[in-house]
Amino acid sequence: MKHYDLLIVDDERRYADMLAKRLSLRRLTCKVCYNGRTAIDLVGEETFPVVILDLQLPDLYGTEVLTRIKQCRPETAVIILTGHGTEKDREQCMACGAHSFMNKPLDIDRLMDMMARIKERSS
């Protein structure tokens, strides 16, 4: 089984694929999926240290996916990524166990710093 550094979950296929490509240039191995149900299945089958999760997915809202991921893999750091998040959304996600909450467009350098801190903490 291949080891992945992170799972990207976003229904905007072009954005998700572009993000995976940019992160692969930073030597991160990424798996991408485009809906919440697939994300939940993948997290149940494989271990991802980090999940980047869009809040607004077509099949399940991000907080439901987040809750299920944390039930299955409490050690997984989930970073919420959204283009339309409110302060209430941020508070709800953090209460459900999100590691952090970021707005689109994603700042790759900030994400890389966050990934390094997550890796240090889990070592």
Regions found by a protein language model. Give the residues of each.
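Two-component/phosphorelay signaling modules centered on CheY-like receiver
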Residues: R13-K31
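Acidic, metal-coordinating helix/loop segments flanking the phosphotransfer/catalytic sites
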Residues: V32-V50
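Acidic catalytic/metal-coordinating carboxylates
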Residues: N35, Y61-E64
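Short amphipathic alpha-helix used as the core "switch/output" element in two-component signaling
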Residues: D41, T63-P74
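The short loop immediately C-terminal to the conserved phospho-acceptor aspartate in CheY-like receiver
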Residues: L55-Q56, H84
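Alpha4 helix (beta4-alpha4-beta5 surface) of REC/receiver domains from two-component response regulators
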Residues: E64, G85-S100
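C-terminal output helix
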Residues: K88, L106-M115
